[in-house]
Amino acid sequence: MAKDVFAVPIFFICFRECVETSIIVSVLLSFIKQTLGQEQDATTRKRLIRQVWWGVAIGLFISVCIGAGMIGAFYGYGKDHFASTEDLWEGIFSLIASVIITIMGAALLRVTKLQEKWRVKLAQALEAKPLTGGTFKNNLKLWAEKYAMFLLPFITVLREGLEAVVFIGGVSLSFPATAFPLPVFTGILAGVAIGYLLYRGGNQASLQIFLIISTCILYLVAAGLFSRGVWYLENNTWNHVIGGDAAETGAGPGSYDIRQSVWHVNCCSPLVNGGGGWGIFNAILGWTNSATYGSVLSYNLYWIAVIVWFVAMRHKERHGRLPVVDPLLNRLRGRKSAEPGNGEQDVEVSTIPSDLQTESKIPKSGASLV
């Protein structure tokens, strides 16, 4: 029977998780190639690309190792013992990934205006800097700057890999072991193919068009991740209320908390039987058939926060200051400098780095974010 050879839910699970990972990785690789395209940047470009692939490889290795133990436990105990914490770490990882992607998207849009400066920054990020002797916060900041292209693919692959393993483990008991290899291979292959097409398209398009399109895609993914993260945390609370995994009841009554529900449809679930096409919408856009107040509000608040952030950046580039934030910060700094014993810190606080001063003097004609 076809069911004994090819498990359709497994295919959609692998395809869904691989598509989201491929989008992030392809955008990063295209960004590196577009930004460091000159011959003199070949060494820096290779090292940054190596960081991306190391992040993918290590994230995949860790998720496979953890997944092997989890799948073994699924078959050994005949029960999903990890469902009680699945939604918790799903929510945490989704929120972290959303914040990282949001920051990365804003940085991408500034490349066309400050492309040469970005080349210098990327090169400086790879310089050997001492990570000892300073405070833990400074050391952590230096480490994050040096391995920025490693962190995002690492977290993304780790999160998507563990998510795929948990979902596969949840449906594995209804399929024989022979039904796993082919759908896993074809699902990953299809996801990689989509990522490759995005990468090729990003390289052939002009830099400005590529940055606009890729940033829009990244923010759609980040908004969906933020909403999904809140939804997972709420679902984790509901699982504790009912004393089990709500997903095991399907998509009908009992699978959601009606007190927190904004809408619910018994079809179109991204979690039941691999999700099918709805699982793809869930991975890229954050679709859910059972929306809660938290997931809907968080999705809208995310976009409001992003809009306010971009308007503030636009205003600061044009006028060199923020109307409310900068006076408040100056007042706080003034109070701090008035305290006894802070004389040496006054110079340090009031000193503005030269690169920030240069940015604030950019002509208004080139002040657009793109």
From Swiss-Prot:
Disruption phenotype: Does not affect the virulence in a murine model of invasive aspergillosis. Displays an 8-fold increase in external siderophore triacetylfusarinine C (TAFC) production after 12h of growth in iron-depleted conditions. InterPro entries: FTR1/Fip1/EfeU (IPR004923). The gene is ftrA. Residues 335-370 are annotated as: Disordered. Belongs to the oxidase-dependent Fe transporter (OFeT) (TC 9.A.10.1) family. Induction: Expression is up-regulated during iron starvation and is controlled by the GATA-type transcription factor sreA and the Zinc cluster transcription factor acuM. The keyword Transmembrane applies. Keywords: Cell membrane, Ion transport, Iron, Iron transport, Membrane, Transmembrane, Transmembrane helix, Transport. One of its GO terms (biological process) is iron ion transmembrane transport. This is High affinity iron permease ftrA. It is a multi-pass membrane protein. High affinity iron permease; part of the reductive iron assimilatory system (RIA), a siderophore-independent high affinity iron uptake mechanism.
